[in-house]
Structure formats: structure tokens, C-alpha cells
């Protein structure tokens, strides 16, 4: 009797199988805008085209994805400057392109300033794109930075970085942090943005994990630093729209499953 039940259950399980084929449509290429402006620094804009999810990534494909000969304008409300296209080596024999200040038109050029809003206009392939951002005033600024033995790790050379800072009273401040180790690049943390919903008006003492390169496979000790490292900590005050973008992007990056 038990054998018969087992056979019936096995047959039932196999009968539930069904092959499903998804007919994924090719999405049209869209313009991807990566624009930055910081206090005391010139604006930079990188324009690329998206490519198919199934594309085989190589240097040539990346080079061909850059959008060239676009008209790119940035304004601080007083001056409007047309950015110039520049080429720089991506890998040996392959060039990448960005737009930044035109040294031939310095009368309208400017760098980022605190408490200033900016608008960006891009004209490419007969289409116009517009966006706006703001560099806020400095709000919370770190009081001190120090290192402690990394928790739950026996290696005494591994260190965790802590930051003590005071958040001014009044909701509406947003932050992003990046770290640079020795002569490396500035890299954002896995959760690089946060707001003042919890820390408003308080002094907090929090661990800030090392920034990560999302092109590399994850490492068990990637949150920590090594004894002897030179660490540069970049603590940014950002506006709400910038916070919302990075918060959404990082949440999607860490989520498992379909977008």
C-alpha cells in the first residue's frame, strides 16, 4: 500500500512539470546620462547608449556606446556654459569621451558652489533632455574618524572605521559617503546614502564600511581596512533627488530576483 502511494505521488509530481518559454523583446537603446558637479570642481557629463542585456561586453562595445557631438549646456542660474567634448584613453587603443568646461569660453565657465542649483540641458539626435540638481549647504560634518579592531575577525590587521558626527536639528538632510584606500579610486559603500530620519539633532558614532567596486566579486572582509592603509573619507551633503536616485539604485542592486 505504501509503495502504491509513493508511486502515485511521484506520478503526480512529474505531471505538474511544465516548460515555459519567455519571449524577451529587445529594448530600444536609450540615452544614459552620468553627470557630476561638486563644490569647487568643474562639471563633467558622460553620455552613453544602453545596450542589450545579452550583449557580450568588450572594449569596442563600450567605446561605441559613448554618445558624441551632443550639445550639452549647464547653468547656475546666472551663467550658462556649453560644455566641450574631450577624449581620454579607456584602455590601450580605445578612447572614451566626456563633456566638461570649454577652456576657450572661460567667461561663462564656473565650478560648483554650496547652496546653488544647477540645470542641465542635452540635445542629442534631435531630442532634448533636461534635469536639475542642487548642492546644499554643509549640514552634518564629521567631528572625528577613528579605527578599531574588526569585529568577529581573528586577523588583528583588519580594522573597522568609525565616524563621530553631529547632525543639526531639523529634518531634510541627506548624505552620501565614499572611501579611497591608498592610491585607489573613491568608491561608494554598499549602502552609501542615508538621511536624518533617525539621527536628526543627535551626535552619532557609526561604522562606515569600506567602499566597494561593484565589478568585483564580493569578499567576506570587504567592509574592513588593513593596518597601514591610508584612507581618505569623502562625506557628501546631497539633495533629496540625488538621495532618492542612489537609494533606489542600491536597493535594486542588492535585491535578488527580477527587477
Residue ranges of predicted features:
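Sec-dependent signal peptide recognition
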Residues: 2-7
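C-terminal motif of bacterial Sec signal peptides marking the signal peptidase cleavage site
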Residues: 12-15
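A sequence/structural signal for flexible, mid-protein segments enriched
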Residues: 17-259
Amino acid at each position: 500500500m505504501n509503495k502504491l502511494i509513493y508511486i502515485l505521488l511521484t506520478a503526480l509530481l512529474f505531471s505538474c512539470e511544465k516548460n515555459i518559454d519567455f519571449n524577451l523583446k529587445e529594448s530600444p537603446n536609450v540615452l544614459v546620462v552620468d553627470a557630476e558637479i561638486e563644490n569647487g570642481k568643474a562639471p563633467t557629463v558622460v553620455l552613453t547608449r544602453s545596450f542589450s542585456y545579452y550583449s557580450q561586453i568588450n572594449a569596442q562595445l563600450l567605446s561605441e556606446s559613448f554618445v558624441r557631438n551632443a550639445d550639452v549646456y549647464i547653468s547656475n542660474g546666472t551663467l550658462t556654459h556649453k560644455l566641450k567634448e574631450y577624449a581620454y584613453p579607456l584602455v590601450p587603443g580605445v578612447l572614451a569621451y566626456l563633456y566638461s568646461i570649454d577652456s576657450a569660453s572661460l567667461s561663462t565657465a564656473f565650478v560648483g558652489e554650496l547652496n546653488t542649483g544647477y540645470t542641465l540641458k542635452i540635445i542629442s539626435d534631435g531630442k532634448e533632455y533636461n534635469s536639475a540638481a542642487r548642492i546644499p549647504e554643509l549640514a552634518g560634518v564629521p567631528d572625528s574618524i577613528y579605527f578599531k579592531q574588526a569585529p568577529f575577525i581573528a586577523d588583528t590587521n583588519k580594522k573597522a572605521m568609525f565616524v563621530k558626527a553631529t547632525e543639526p536639528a531639523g529634518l531634510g538632510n541627506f548624505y552620501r559617503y565614499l572611501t579611497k584606500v591608498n592610491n585607489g579610486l573613491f568608491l561608494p559603500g554598499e549602502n552609501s546614502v542615508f538621511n536624518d530620519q533617525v539621527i536628526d539633532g543627535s551626535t552619532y558614532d557609526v561604522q562606515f564600511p569600506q567602499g566597494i567596486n561593484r565589478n568585483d566579486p564580493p569578499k567576506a572582509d570587504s567592509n574592513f581596512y588593513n593596518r597601514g592603509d591610508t584612507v581618505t573619507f569623502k562625506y557628501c551633503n546631497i539633495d533629496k533627488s540625488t538621495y532618492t536616485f542612489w537609494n533606489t539604485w542600491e536597493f535594486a542592486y542588492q535585491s535578488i530576483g527580477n527587477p
